[in-house]
């Protein structure tokens, strides 16, 4: 398990307000999933005080680029709030929060909190959601009052084009991943601890049928080609570095490598179809700086905040507010040009533990762990 570390994210940089602005187009996001409706049990956020200052400890599984964008844009609106970041996987962060429950250090979590998590983290998060919850696109408002859903993570293959060509392959589909040439050449993360990996398992279930014999037959055939990495970011970084041919991953992580100049990888949405899970942020129960945390959650979920973030990132992340504007220079493929499959979020949430148990049983006998 990797160590936790604080990220230095250019807090001392002097940036103009234009740094988080930009020319924008129309709003664009994934089609609505089959998701449970908001329970309405959570209270909405109050208007934040005119002046906020002090500290804010953010636990996050997001990429360094995403965190840089958030802190830069957030500090333009709240320059007197000092943000400290602790980075780790969703599993690492929730385990740490549970251990700190009697004396919380963190104020909020961003990333890795998925709509499929249900109430499993009710002991560490406050039942509080953003005042912008009603502005979320259909199907992506809070599932239970614990999480404010701010962005979508879409399933994608990250393909090393040089290695693909050397093997004489043209990887387009899930069926293509079963090629014997890819034995030990597909990198994946552990769905027991990685929300990105669970997102990919969920998409396989959505393509082949949730918990169906066809889905499990496919997974069993795929496993000999898989290598499990210690972090979800390895599923695109190690592909770009030439260690693996394919990574089963999420689009914003992979597209940022392309944006940063990588020329030996491409993003391939499964030809059978892709889907997205909503990820969000959550207020830590009894955290030391709740008002600052609420201000950040509201910023993350507002059209203003999401438009600023999208412009700063050049459209490398899909957001949930129906009113946010996608920049004209967005790197992601427009949703209208992609094949989407429906995802039964309610079923996957209710049966997550059983699905993971079945996965673990198959992996234990796959002979490559």
Spans of model-derived segments:
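Periplasmic-binding protein-like
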Residues: 153, 181-192, 217-222, 228, 261-285, 299-323
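Extracytoplasmic ligand-binding site segments that recognize negatively charged/polar headgroups
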Residues: 57-68, 90-91, 105-243
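Bacterial signal peptide processing site
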Residues: 21-24
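A bilobed periplasmic-binding-protein/Venus flytrap-type ligand-binding module shared by bacterial periplasmic
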Residues: 158-163, 205, 277-289, 299-300, ...
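Short, polar/charged alpha-helical segment
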Residues: 47-52, 57-82, 119, 157, ...
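C-terminal motif of bacterial Sec signal peptides marking the signal peptidase cleavage site
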Residues: 15-19
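A ligand-binding cleft/hinge motif common to bilobed small-molecule-binding domains
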Residues: 115-120, 245-264
């Amino acid at each position: 398990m990797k160590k936790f570390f604080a990220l230095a994210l250019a807090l001392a940089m002097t940036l103009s307000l234009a740094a988080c602005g930009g020319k924008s187009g129309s709003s664009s996001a994934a089609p609505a999933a089959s998701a449970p409706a908001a329970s309405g049990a959570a209270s909405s956020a109050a208007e934040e005080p005119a002046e906020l200052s002090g500290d804010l400890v953010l636990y996050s599984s997001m990429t360094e680029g995403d965190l840089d964008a958030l802190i830069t844009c957030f500090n333009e609106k709240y320059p007197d709030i000092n943000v400290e970041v602790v980075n780790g996987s969703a599993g690492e962060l929730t385990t740490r929060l549970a251990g700190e429950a009697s004396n919380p250090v963190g104020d909020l979590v961003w990333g890795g909190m998925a709509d499929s998590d249900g109430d499993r983290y009710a002991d560490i998060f406050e039942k509080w959601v953003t005042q912008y919850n009603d502005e979320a696109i259909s199907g992506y408002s809070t599932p239970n009052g614990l999480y404010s859903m701010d962005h979508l993570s879409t399933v994608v293959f990250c393909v090393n084009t040089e290695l693909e060509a050397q093997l004489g392959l043209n990887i387009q589909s899930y069926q293509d991943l079963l090629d014997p040439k890819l034995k030990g050449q597909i990198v994946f993360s552990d769905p027991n601890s990685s929300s990105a990996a669970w997102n990919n398992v969920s998409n396989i279930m959505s393509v082949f049928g949730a918990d169906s014999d066809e889905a499990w037959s496919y997974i069993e055939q795929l496993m000999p080609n898989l290598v499990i990495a210690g972090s979800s970011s390895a599923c695109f970084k190690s592909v770009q570095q030439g260690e693996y041919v394919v990574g089963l991953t999420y689009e914003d992580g992979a597209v940022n490598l392309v944006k940063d100049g990588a020329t030996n990888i491409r993003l391939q949405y499964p030809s059978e179809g892709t889907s997205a899970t909503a990820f969000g942020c959550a207020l830590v129960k009894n955290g030391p700086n709740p008002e600052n945390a609420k201000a950040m959650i509201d910023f993350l979920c507002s059209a203003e905040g999401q438009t600023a973030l999208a412009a700063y990132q050049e459209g490398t992340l899909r957001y949930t507010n129906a009113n946010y504007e996608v920049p004209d220079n967005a790197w992601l493929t427009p949703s209208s040009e992609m094949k989407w499959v429906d995802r039964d979020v309610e079923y996957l949430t209710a049966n997550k533990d059983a699905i993971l148990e079945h996965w673990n049983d198959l992996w234990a006998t796959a002979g490559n762990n």
